[in-house]
Amino acid sequence: MNQYVLYLVCLVAGYLIGSVLFAELITKLVSNQNIRELGNGNPGAYNVFRNVGKFWGVLTGLLDAVKALVPMWIAYQFFHITDTTALGCIGIGAVIGHGYPLYYHFKGGRAASTLLGMYAYFIGIELLIALAVDVIVLFGFIKKEYGIWGPSILIALSGILCLFFPHELGVKILVWIGALITLFFNRDKLTEKKEKVPKKVSRQQS
């Protein structure tokens, strides 16, 4: 098979798998509700965690990660695809599919968990180190709502760490392409400004 045809096939395959939104399926199955009508309306693991149940949120996040991790592993183990770019196209395709899912009118989630699935395949050691640091920073120092900051720190730190590990250049490029795509999907949350609640001014009665 022509190299570029292989890349296209892997990208499309990853995209079709990534287009399955487990947040939609699990929420409907467990509570018979539409995840888009709950919380912030985002069809992602964190919204399921907060509005459907912690267990179901964690399960959703794991399944979203599996969308990238398992197809990449299967492609390597059973289809003997060793080309780093081809494997990366599966992961990138899954990330794009989660953000612009074919089966849900191209309205998807933020794809952080799916990207972390790709990271688990390519840069597993860096991901584990970043996870440990992330937990310490979030719960030891910041002590704020997990929200967007947990995944953002994890993704950024994993990407930075991979630059200092002996990976081939293609892996590092794919890791950062995935990070930039996910950053694009999260652009509204990262630039969001919280409204300040005006303080009540007490007036002395004359």
Residue locations for each model-derived region?
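C-terminal ends of transmembrane helices
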Residues: 23-26, 95-107, 135-144, 186-193
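Helix-coil boundary and interhelical linker segments in multi-pass alpha-helical membrane proteins
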Residues: 1-10, 70-89, 120-127, 162-174
